[in-house]
Amino acid sequence: MKTFVAKPAEVKRDWYIVDAEGKTLGRMAAEIAARLRGKHKPEYTPHVDCGDYIVVINAEKIAVTGNKRTDKMYHHVTGYVGNLKSTNFETLVGSKPTRPVEFAIKGMLPRGPLGRAMLKKLKVYAGAEHPHAAQQPKELDL
């Protein structure tokens, strides 16, 4: 018996919608990352993008436990000498409400071209409205 290898053209991708309101950031991100990779499918192949499309709504209402709302820091380099910029979770949600969800999920995906292709199937929106009604996404309860 030969080992099954999924072919990119034969992968069936579904659309799912996740309501992030009141969900814990890391637990939700781990489940979404696994679905973006396609690990929930029996035909999962590590070197092929087998995952589904995921639409996350209400990202601004995500929950974090403990003191992470004020203590969790996000860093980025501006490209200028000595300019490492840092901001905490609360400030980042105030200015760019989708970023904490995107950063958490991106950190759980593989690095390289395959991981970037998987991340393109993630759509995150701050509010309850999204432009993907035509794809008829199924509700995903995490």
UniProtKB/Swiss-Prot annotation:
InterPro entries referenced in this protein's UniProt entry, alphabetically: Ribosomal_uL13, Ribosomal_uL13_bac-type, Ribosomal_uL13_CS, Ribosomal_uL13_sf
PROSITE patterns membership: RIBOSOMAL_L13
Segment forming the signal sequence: none
Record-level Gene Ontology MF annotations: mRNA binding; structural constituent of ribosome
UniProt keyword annotations, A-Z: Ribonucleoprotein, Ribosomal protein
Keyword presence, Ubl conjugation: no
BP term (GO), one: negative regulation of translation
Pfam families in the cross-refs: Ribosomal_L13
Family classification: Belongs to the universal ribosomal protein uL13 family.
HAMAP family associated with the record: Ribosomal_uL13
UniProt-recorded name of the protein: Large ribosomal subunit protein uL13
Organism (species): Hydrogenovibrio crunogenus (strain DSM 25203 / XCL-2)
Name of the encoding gene: rplM
